[in-house]
């Protein structure tokens, strides 16, 4: 990594935000010296070294609003210029693999874990024993070798437009197998397997559920009903409320965002009855 100390400092902040929720801590000044939030206690040397590096570059795979807020908060706290590029998780994986140990960014922030695991296995991530990893509620939310640490979790499921289903006199799908019904042909949106970590997780989930061969067969059969493959994992959710997408596969928190932020009361969220990731 080019800016190692700033990278470590960013990870400390990310894990601390997991524990603190939406609380926004600002540095307090005592004369010319800044006093930072308590979770940075004892890290003065790290902060000084990070500032000396001057800039932090972030690849972000979460929603851009969240990414921008995190980067802005880091910059405000430490006075370190922070820039980001928003890419789907699969795109970041491909970019890191192409850069092959000579990265143009310092931090990978957000997204699904499968691409992180691939890059870790390829030796493309920097392990770090984070001081604040104890803020995570379980070891399952971090890599065993400290290559990555979780900052949020989501549930994979279906988002449906209830108005459109009623108009077509259709029942909402209750489970994965329902998505293969002929009546849903041309109604389902899913993200692209080549670019979106969400879609890669769908593949992983089906293989775990059905076994490799049957899982791949399921995906081939599902393709017959897919109308659109979006670049980003959140793409389907953004089109359900308008009715352009009747059934979207993705993380349910993306559907909640559409309901809360955009007032789409015609969006219903479904957790597959036989299980999910």
Model-derived features with residue positions:
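Histidine- and/or cysteine-centered catalytic micro-motif in compact active-site loops
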Residues: 193, 233, 251-255, 272-274
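Extracytoplasmic ligand-binding site segments that recognize negatively charged/polar headgroups
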Residues: 57-71, 83-99, 103-244
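Short, structurally constrained coil/turn elements
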Residues: 52, 76-78, 101, 184, ...
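A ligand-binding cleft/hinge motif common to bilobed small-molecule-binding domains
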Residues: 114-118, 246-266
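Short, low-complexity disordered leader/linker segments with a strong preference
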Residues: 1-53
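Short, polar/charged alpha-helical segment
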Residues: 41-51, 57, 61-81, 158, ...
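Short, flexible turn/loop "capping" segments at secondary-structure junctions
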Residues: 49-51, 150-151, 198, 274-277
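Extracytoplasmic/periplasmic substrate-recognition and gating elements
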Residues: 235-238, 262-277
